[in-house]
């Protein structure tokens, strides 16, 4: 709704849906951060981290990293590659539900877009209040069918 040009791109070229799914995941990172314990001494960008130190990975910040994403504050369904860390950086802590989340989002857009003429807000968005999870609690919209 905030990017009608991007919606038009998807409707005109459904082959962009997989890219759009990744961009939505990057843009609307559902888990804000995770705390971990360093298992060994390491230096990261000049900062020493010792084994046993507590560290926090801010996924929402990493997904806007200007050294990784050109124009990171722009929503772009054509962004490719899209190396977001929405489901974690990989390894043993990678989100088990990542594949299902991608599948559900892809199917939603494959089924909705051909039937959608318009979508517009009809009231204020109510966001979840959490320091851990980022999401929408209530979002009233009006949908026009084709």
Spans of features found by a protein language model:
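Cytochrome P450
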Residues: 1-146
């Amino acid at each position: 709704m905030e990017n009608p040009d991007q919606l038009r791109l998807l409707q005109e070229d459904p082959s962009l849906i997989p890219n759009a799914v990744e961009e939505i995941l990057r843009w609307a990172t559902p888990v804000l951060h995770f705390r971990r314990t360093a298992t060994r001494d390491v230096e990261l960008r000049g900062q020493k981290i010792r084994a046993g130190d507590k560290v926090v990975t801010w996924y929402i910040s990493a997904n806007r990293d200007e050294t990784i994403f050109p124009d990171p504050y722009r929503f772009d369904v054509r962004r490719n590659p899209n190396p977001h860390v929405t489901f974690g950086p990989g390894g043993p802590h990678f989100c088990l539900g990542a594949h299902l989340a991608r599948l559900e989002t892809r199917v939603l857009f494959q089924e909705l877009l051909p039937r959608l003429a318009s979508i517009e807000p009809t009231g204020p968005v109510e966001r979840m209040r959490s320091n851990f999870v980022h999401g929408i609690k209530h979002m009233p919209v009006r949908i026009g069918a084709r």
